[in-house]
Amino acid sequence: LRASWGLSGNNNIGNYEHTATMSQGGYVYGNTVETAYWQGTFKDAAIGWEKTSQYNVGFDLGLFNGRVNLIGNYYNSLSYDLLYDQPISSISGSSSVKTNLKNAKVRNSGVDFQIDGRILTGDFKWNVSANISVNRNKVVDLGGINDLYLVSERNVVSHVTRSGLPIGSFYGYIADGIISEKDYTNIMIDKSNLVNGKFPDGYQLIGPAVPNYNNIHPGDVKWRDVDKNGLITENDREILGNAYPDFTYGISTDFSYKNFDLRATFTGSQGAEVINFQKYYLYNMEGSGNQLASRSE
């Protein structure tokens, strides 16, 4: 049996990150070019390491004179004083300053299991090993900061970091199919009932909700109206998943007979989700570029 605890720091902040610098330039004052100085970079003088406190408990078990070995481990780590590029007003001359998010915490916890076996019979030797790992990532607190958004392709928000969820969860609208000719007819009926961009109280949509009633066509994506207000807005974005797998695993084996040997290793992960941006470009129906033929279906 074994147990351990440790405190480590992430110092990936570069040298002199706490030191602001001055910039120099010239300006014309009367008939003379004068030299001027201003603060060129903004720094947090109190910036420090991002810290991670972690404990582990586990066991190592050997059976049958060491021919079968079992290894198990449980870990729980808490990272705090997270490093973050805090946005600041652009009138300051900079767009962000690297700092520690006070009271912000991220937890990683999980288990690892491994089993090893050996067969030794004369000139024949065979070793096989299998392992499985499960990790859970969770933002415990953002230290009073609102949701952190990541903007990706076409300046679209695609990820969000939010308390209670894994870091960088996928975030966006839910597609419910394609707008048909019948949908379009009903949408135009709904459009005729709009008053100053809103529907009268109690009005029931005939067609699907759309983001812009003045720019909609058959074949456009039909988005889910999550808040049921009859319009597709930013409030209809939902958590779509995350890139963390349910578990990862691996198997390795090697055997030998006299002067012949063979080795093989297999690794994999299960349950991870991805954003297919290649599919986005081939199905987005924007501009005059080529699209996959199946898009017409």
What are these model-predicted stretches?
Residues 79, 136-138, 216, 256-297:
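C-terminal beta-signal and adjacent terminal beta-strands/loops
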